[in-house]
Amino acid sequence: MKEYRVYLERARSRQQDFLYPLIFREYIYGLAYSHNFNRSIFVENGGYDNKYSLLNVKRLITRMYQQNHLIISANDSNKNPFLGYNKNFYSQIISEGFAIVVEIPFFLQLSSSLEEAEIIKSYKNLRSIHSVFPFLEDKFTYLNYVSDIRIPYPIHLEILVQILRYWVKDVPFFHLLRLFLYHFCNWNCFIPTKKSISTFSKSNPRLFLFLYNFYVCEYESIFLFLRNKSYHLRLKSFSVFFERIFFYAKREHLVEVFSKDFSYTLPFFKDPNIHYVRYQGKCILASKNVPFLMNKWKYYFIHLWQCFFDVWSQPRTININQLSEHSFQLLGYFSNVRLNRSVVRSQMLQNTFLIEIVSKKLDIIVPIIPLIRSLAKAKFCNVLGHPISKPVWADSSDFDIIERFLRICRNLSHYYNGSSKKKSLYRIKYILRLSCIKTLACKHKSTVRAFLKRSGSEELLEEFFTEEEEILSLIFPRDSFTLHRFHRNRIWYLDILFSNDLVNDE
């Protein structure tokens, strides 16, 4: 945030709050490269970071300055001098630059709102996505119905650009952004296909995620306004979800604009026990009341997307289920409410009674099948979960191979330590351990048994299972009972800023 403030102040001294000049500054692309290089991920990234160089950036900026090169022919985009022979590479650099520039004013607004709320010290802890699960454990055990909602993608990227125009008043910047989107990313057709959306999101992830998250923020601002108008008890805990950038100003703006139209509490949405949780493009709506009110919210979402955002959504895509009978998926976990029944003997005078007590507990389970499917896609095992070697890593040293497998295993263990049942997590560790051994045996052109016999013993890769115990022993007393208890219980971490990349939440 400090770097953003410095760069924006430097631009203000020259161009009166315009974002357009920042596109032609070399340090913006250096900042984008630094952000990608330092991002903590679970699977190694083979993106354009290794190809980044200041010479490429200077060459790109020089071509952008020459306005005649910005007149693009859609039929001749592969030979355009603006992109040269590295169309995809330059396109990715430009998209990273756009994302950095357009994020600057919103990061500044976010930092100022944090300073006003006096919660800077706890900001990093509150950013952890694991902080969502204690909320679920505390609230969802008292609820009966859950609605699993997938927020639809906009039919055209122009909708996202139009939404962004309400917040950033810089016409030249949006002209250049549209030029980039329509000609470099194949968005010049009236209705882009699902394949083109997927291609753009993979080749330009940062810019796409920013535009998509901004679209979600717009939808949630309207949802929050109507939710607050439907209850006598106003919502107070929404501010901890900091991904809703510039949320306070938007909420005040909505209250000011629509106060005349909604001057009384909406009677048809009254539900004092409704909870809403979202991460990325998926949200969970849970309630204690009958499904009738949940259906009202369901059709409200559908009409909101269709009327305000021109996004088509089918009612069958939103399911309403009982929490005790169905599970929902969020942040790479499967969650459901389990009923625990216990019998208590009670005695009054000479009479004895048996009382059955039913309590609810939120079960959060590791999704073993999607994880095995992701491991199979990454060539660590087959579709049945049988470990296989990874020959593409055989050129590395033994230490590097072991370190790569350990890094993935460590991050998976770190992320899924909050699960109710750890057996699935141990199975994933077992797959990675055997895959590592088979990769080393393949490198040395030997069988697994001969390699382990030559190496000394099967304790060669014991770090896969002992490292977590060593970390816990540094935090808690070195007591076997204590460590065993923490291995069985859930452990949520406050430094998880990204979801597990091996679970594709689609």
Swiss-Prot record:
Keywords: Chloroplast, mRNA processing, Plastid, RNA-binding, tRNA processing
Keyword Heme set for record: no
GO biological process terms on file: mRNA processing; RNA splicing; tRNA processing
Coiled coil: none
One cellular-component annotation, GO: chloroplast
Residues annotated as transmembrane: none
InterPro entries, sorted: Domain_X, Maturase_MatK, Maturase_MatK_N
Entry keyword annotation includes RNA-binding: yes
A GO term for molecular function: RNA binding
Subcellular location: Plastid, Chloroplast
Main location: plastid
Family: Belongs to the intron maturase 2 family. MatK subfamily.
Physiological role: Usually encoded in the trnK tRNA gene intron. Probably assists in splicing its own and other chloroplast group II introns.
Annotated protein name in UniProt: Maturase K
Gene source species: Trifolium albopurpureum
